[in-house]
C-alpha cells in the first residue's frame, strides 16, 4: 500500500491533508492522522499546512510520519503535475527483520538532532522494535 503524506513544489512543503488537489484521495486520506497527532501532541509542524522547504528538510519532517502512521519506508515520486510526492510504502517485503543486539546497539548509538527529545525517541524505538532500551 502507499500513503501520500506531502508534496514539494519550488520552495514549499505541503502536507497531503492540506493539499486541495489531493486531500480527498484515498492515497492522502491517512495523512490527516498527522494533523490530528500534531494537535494532540502539540507538534506545530504537523498542523501547519505549508512550510518552507528548508525548514521541512532541516527538521526531517517527513520522517515524523513514519512512527505516527506505523509505516517505515519513505519514497519520493514525481506526480502528474510535476511536483514531488512523498509517499510511505508498506508491503511484507519492506518489513524489518527481527532486531539483533548489534543492530539495536548501533541504532541507539546514533545521536538524534538537538530538537528531538532523545529519551522519548529511545523509548519509542524500544516500543516499536520490542526491545529493552
Label each PLM-derived region with a short phrase.
Residues 1-30:
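N-terminal membrane-targeting/anchoring modules of bacterial envelope and secretion proteins
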Residues 8-10, 69-70, 79-81, 128-132:
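Short, solvent-exposed coil/turn segments at beta-strand boundaries
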Residues 19-120:
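Surface-exposed beta-loop interaction hotspot
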Residues 114-133:
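C-terminal structured interaction module
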Residues 1, 86-87, 122-126:
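Long, contiguous hydrophobic alpha-helical segments, chiefly transmembrane helices and signal peptides
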Amino acid at each position: 500500500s502507499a500513503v501520500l503524506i506531502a508534496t514539494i513544489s519550488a520552495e514549499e512543503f505541503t502536507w497531503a491533508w492540506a493539499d486541495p488537489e489531493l486531500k480527498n484521495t484515498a492515497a492522502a486520506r491517512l495523512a490527516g492522522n498527522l494533523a490530528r497527532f500534531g494537535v494532540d501532541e502539540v507538534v506545530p509542524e504537523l498542523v501547519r499546512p505549508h512550510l518552507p522547504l528548508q525548514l521541512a528538510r532541516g527538521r526531517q519532517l517527513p520522517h515524523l510520519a513514519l512512527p505516527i502512521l506505523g509505516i517505515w519506508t519513505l519514497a519520493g515520486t514525481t506526480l502528474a503535475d510535476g511536483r514531488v510526492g512523498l509517499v510511505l510504502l508498506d508491503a511484507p517485503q519492506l518489513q524489518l527483520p527481527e532486531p539483533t543486539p548489534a543492530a539495536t546497539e548501533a541504532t541507539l548509538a546514533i545521536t538524534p538532532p538537538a530538537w528531538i527529545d532523545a529519551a522519548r525517541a529511545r523509548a519509542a524505538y524500544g516500543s516499536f522494535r520490542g526491545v529493552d532500551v
